[in-house]
Amino acid sequence: MLKNALTLCALVGAVCTPLSLKAQEQNTRTYFTARITAQEVPQQLSSDERDHYRRLFSAIEGEQWAEVEAMLSQRPGGLLTDVARAEYYLHANSPRVELPALLDWLRSGQNLPQAEQIGRLSITRGATSAPNLPYVRPTQSQGSMPRRTRPSSIDDGTMPAEMRSAILERISNDDPFGARQLLDGIDASLSSAARAEWRQRVAWSFFIENLDAEALAMAQTVGAGSGSWVAEGDWVAGLAAWRLNDCQTASEYFQRSAAGAASPNLRAAALYWGSRAAMRCRQPDLSTRLLTNAASDDRTMYGMLAAEQLGQRLPNRVESADFSQEDWRSVQSERNVRIAIALAEIGQDNLGSQVLLHQARIGDPRNYAALSRLARALDFPQTQLFMAYNAPSGAQADPASHFPSPKIAPYNGWRVDPALAFAHILQESAFRPNATSPANAQGLMQITPITVRQHAPSLGVSASQVNIYDPEINLAFGQRNLEMLRDHPTTRGRLPVIMAAYNAGMTPITRWESEIRDFGDPLLYMEAIPYWETRGYVAIVMRNYWMYERQANAASPSRMALAQNGWPLFPDGNGLNNGRVYMSAGGN
């Protein structure tokens, strides 16, 4: 009933009053908070063993060699002794290790990742042959999750460098007419592919200046060229025609863009917008067909949005992310698995990750997905991402590995939806706690020094004493920054605007409030953001957010809102939006 009412409101383009949605029965905060303390794998070490190995690895790091020797002799057959011996033998400053000790190690440690290096060392110490080690299968790229990427610029020599710079300067100075005049003087000498690129760039410049008739006219000429820029030109033509309320032309060019798109994201976006245009033209059958095609790729924001609008259940892509009892039964016999778990128990995450990845390359390829879920259970987010993007022949990681969810929280507790924070982190730093950008943004959520100074007082800390690379501290500052953006009068709590502000800052966001001609339509706002980076950022972070909601098997108020032309609001700490959805007057 409610969905039908919202759809009718969208179809007639009416201004709708705020509607109250039933509070969702599931939330992301409960799921991700529970994971922090969840014991997902059996403990491998006793309390005494954990204490022993912590002191042993600390002694190795501190180059206390006499103590290392003594402690190694105390537990010669311990689960982590071979790893510790390898770290000791291969340390740059450790005492010389002779051949008998190396050969002894190779008899028990041949399945460890250090075996190849120790085998080479044994040859230098006089071994007559290389050790017989397990075959380490090479990994192959598995590709990445789809994202909207701009086609590569055509560099075939037909566009002179000085003319390129001059046209781009006109575009950056909000002078599309000047850019078109320059292009007109060189257009005939461009290659077909270069012609498509530069006509598209000028067409987009007209569009972001709200010169829709000029944008449409220019974009319609892009098809005279060739290559991947043609689909981008058709996309601009569709958007410009939409804003001109020419649904027939918009539908035609969105369908052209979808047919020619090399990017799954552009294809899904064009199909979705084509469906909107067809519905505006009162062509429901065509609209449904295009929407169904868009929904076929649930890895994209628009694919998930189309499925939501159709009422389709999304496939189980990331919903079964947790390490299961069945997973444990399939890998528990592998000694390296037990070693990786034990290393995680004593805080040796880097070594644990190395052992786990090595096992993934020497073990049964059928266990690769289970091992990727084990990486999640052990809180190895970067290992998860590596396994998502790389796998030996015949193996494939769990798709949820593209969306790690580490067992962390801000030092002052979660105040925002953890799924939203993770969605930003994945794009900002790929969960690298020591990441630093060229602009000196730092840590998981890429916090700048000025942001530290801005929020330190409200967090009750001294800016000069903050270790922004500490994940719990970084999360607290990132969370506070999101809250500040939520409360800013310009964003009015609108989630897409807040996402854009996190990337671009409030200065352009405030300017865009009057510059972006979106008719109150949130999707049109997202597609008309002038900055390419920010436009892509919002779409990617929104996609990430929905994937994390799916991972938690939680409902998605923001996806429901956008599917009904509503502005999704910033969620509360539980992932809910307090039941509020503000409807736009922007069309279908």
Could you say what each language-model-derived stretch is?
Residues 24, 33-127, 136, 188, ...:
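Alpha-helical, heptad-rich or low-complexity scaffold/stalk segments
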Residues 29-32, 57-66, 93-99, 140-144, ...:
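Helix-turn-helix repeat elements of alpha-solenoid scaffolds
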Residues 86-90, 99-115, 121, 186, ...:
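Catalytic glycan-binding domains that act on GlcNAc-containing polysaccharides
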Residues 24-84, 131-172, 318-327, 331-333, ...:
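N-terminal leader/linker segments that initiate helical-solenoid repeat arrays
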Residues 18-20:
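N-terminal signal peptide c-region/cleavage motif recognized by signal peptidases
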Residues 76, 110, 154-155, 190, ...:
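Structural signature of alpha-solenoid helical repeat scaffolds
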